[in-house]
């Protein structure tokens, strides 16, 4: 736990008592502050009370006593409309912050020079965060991993000079962290997302920009217009900007050429790493993730040799191009996290041909219409869930398909067909381009079911992260 000593002897209001909310409340109290916490869910309030946290209905509170108001990132700050607690805080002139801001203030208070790498972006941030954490940890350094990736940031160990923090930040967390000042900040990409909570794409981009704007080193992927504009703007303001690209050859910065990762400066181009044979980092999208990780780790003082070792041993993340197993020459890949066509595109682009594609579930707007350019790579599709009839119409005569209905049937049929393929490496790919809740509780349960079905096949050799 990180006790928030920066708030010692002050009184703090807190709203939102989910998992991270209770952790935040405990950290505030451990630092010597008084707290009044609340939630709209009576069960959450009861859990907080049983954990020894002082609770009280903030609608009845005297807001003049509060030094700050700590808001859960899941609670609306501005859109579609501010939560009632936000209105009360603003009316009383009380500053509204979140758990990441509390971490930043405590770091500034007790160990302002400890390395702090913060990562954001619409896509790829969890993989990049996990990769950076893995590289640093593999060197034997003291590394703390948390934030939006699943570990509440205030449950980590307290800041000290030689302790590295690797923190994934959502737009909601950034919006509640006005003092965010990482040693290295990463903005991978921007596409429309969470606009119901941010009002417009411009506002969403402006919030994401804050993470890199106050960074010691701003590492920005420039393959979309929003990030390109942010990089240009920050560079013009005198901030140290390092550009990365998975698509463009840069005159200055870091870019990918296939599996080669290159650095360009002053007319010189040097190869700094290769992803050849690293199955957990297959595909152009992972080349961008690796570029960001390399630059961040270099800025934090790691050597290229240390970084290379970490890249090669990275196991990948579950449900994100996760290599589950092999049977003979057939590779089985779990990309259950791909819940829309945009997320499935990188998976299909990662294999040149002979893909046995398991796809379907609850379809999103547009279905798989945007993926037609990848259809020549697909040997056969196996359609599951509610989307089966719709996707069958989209595939038409372009791709052989069967309606498998269930994931278990799809795995069995795809494994058999791929095993009869004469290609050097056929791949059975679960990349559903759909939500899961017609047949599964969430994408994790769907991915687990795929993994279990694959590993139950006779002759499958389990794997994770190998080429």
From Swiss-Prot:
Subcellular location: Cytoplasm
Source organism, top-level taxon: Bacteria
Biological process annotations from GO: cell division; cell wall organization; peptidoglycan biosynthetic process; regulation of cell shape
EC numbers on record: 6.3.2.9
Keyword Cell division: yes
Keywords: ATP-binding, Cell cycle, Cell division, Cell shape, Cell wall biogenesis/degradation, Cytoplasm, Ligase, Nucleotide-binding, Peptidoglycan synthesis
Alphabetized GO MF terms: ATP binding; tetrahydrofolylpolyglutamate synthase activity; UDP-N-acetylmuramoylalanine-D-glutamate ligase activity
Catalytic activity of the protein: UDP-N-acetyl-alpha-D-muramoyl-L-alanine + D-glutamate + ATP = UDP-N-acetyl-alpha-D-muramoyl-L-alanyl-D-glutamate + ADP + phosphate + H(+)
RNA-binding in keyword set: no
Alphabetical list of InterPro entries matching this protein: Folylpolyglutamate_synth_CS, Mur-like_cat_sf, Mur_ligase_C, Mur_ligase_C_dom_sf, Mur_ligase_cen, MurD, NAD(P)-bd_dom_sf
Residue positions binding ATP: 121-127
Chief localisation class: cytoplasm
Coiled-coil intervals, chain numbering: none
PANTHER family named among the record's database cross-references: UDP-N-ACETYLMURAMOYLALANINE--D-GLUTAMATE LIGASE (PTHR43692:SF1)
NCBIfam families: murD
Role, per record: Cell wall formation. Catalyzes the addition of glutamate to the nucleotide precursor UDP-N-acetylmuramoyl-L-alanine (UMA).
Family: Belongs to the MurCDEF family.
Name of the protein: UDP-N-acetylmuramoylalanine--D-glutamate ligase
Organism: Brucella suis biovar 1 (strain 1330)
Gene name of the record: murD
């Amino acid at each position: 736990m990180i006790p928030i000593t920066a708030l010692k002897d002050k009184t703090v209001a807190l709203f939102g008592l989910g998992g991270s909310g209770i952790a935040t409340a405990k950290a505030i109290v451990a630092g010597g502050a008084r707290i009044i916490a609340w939630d709209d869910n009576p069960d959450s309030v009861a859990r907080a009370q049983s954990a020894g946290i002082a609770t009280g209905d903030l609608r009845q509170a005297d807001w003049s006593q509060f030094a700050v108001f700590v808001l859960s990132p899941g609670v609306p700050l501005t859109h579609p409309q501010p939560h009632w607690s936000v209105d009360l805080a603003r009316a009383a002139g009380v500053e509204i912050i979140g758990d990441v801001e509390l971490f930043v203030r405590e770091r500034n208070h007790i160990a302002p020079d400890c390395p702090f790498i913060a990562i954001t972006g619409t896509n790829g941030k969890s993989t990049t965060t996990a990769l950076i954490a893995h590289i640093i940890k593999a060197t034997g350094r003291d590394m703390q991993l948390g934030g939006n990736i699943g570990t509440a940031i205030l449950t980590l160990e307290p800041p000290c000079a030689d302790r590295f923090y690797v923190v994934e930040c959502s737009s909601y967390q950034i919006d509640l962290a006005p003092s965010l000042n990482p040693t290295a900040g990463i903005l991978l990409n921007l596409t429309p997302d969470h606009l119901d909570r941010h009002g417009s794409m411009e506002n969403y981009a402006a919030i994401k920009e804050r993470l890199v704007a106050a960074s010691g080193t701003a590492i920005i992927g420039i393959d979309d217009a929003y990030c390109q504009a942010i990089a240009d703007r920050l560079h013009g303001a005198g901030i140290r900007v390092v550009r990365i690209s998975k698509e463009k050859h840069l005159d200055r910065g870091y870019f990918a050429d296939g599996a080669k990762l290159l650095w360009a400066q002053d007319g010189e181009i040097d190869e700094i790493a290769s992803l050849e044979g690293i199955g957990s980092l297959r595909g152009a999208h992972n080349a961008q993730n690796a570029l960001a990780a390399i630059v961040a780790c270099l800025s934090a003082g790691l050597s290229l040799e240390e970084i290379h070792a970490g890249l090669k041993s990275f196991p990948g993340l579950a449900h994100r191009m996760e290599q589950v197993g092999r049977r003979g020459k057939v590779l089985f890949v779990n990309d259950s996290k791909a819940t829309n066509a945009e997320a499935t595109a990188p998976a299909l682009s990662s294999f040149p041909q002979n893909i046995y594609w398991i796809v379907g579930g609850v379809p999103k707007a547009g279905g798989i219409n945007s993926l037609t350019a990848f259809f020549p790579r697909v040997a056969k599709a196996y359609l599951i869930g509610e989307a089966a009839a719709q996707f069958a119409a989209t595939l038409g005569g372009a791709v052989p398909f069967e309606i498998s209905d269930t994931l278990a049937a799809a795995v069995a049929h795809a494994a058999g067909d791929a095993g009869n393929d004469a290609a050097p490496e056929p791949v059975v790919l679960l990349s559903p381009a759909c939500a899961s809740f017609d047949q599964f509780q969430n994408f994790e349960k769907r991915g687990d079911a795929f993994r279990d079905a694959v590993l139950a096949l006779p002759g499958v050799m389990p794997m994770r992260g190998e080429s």
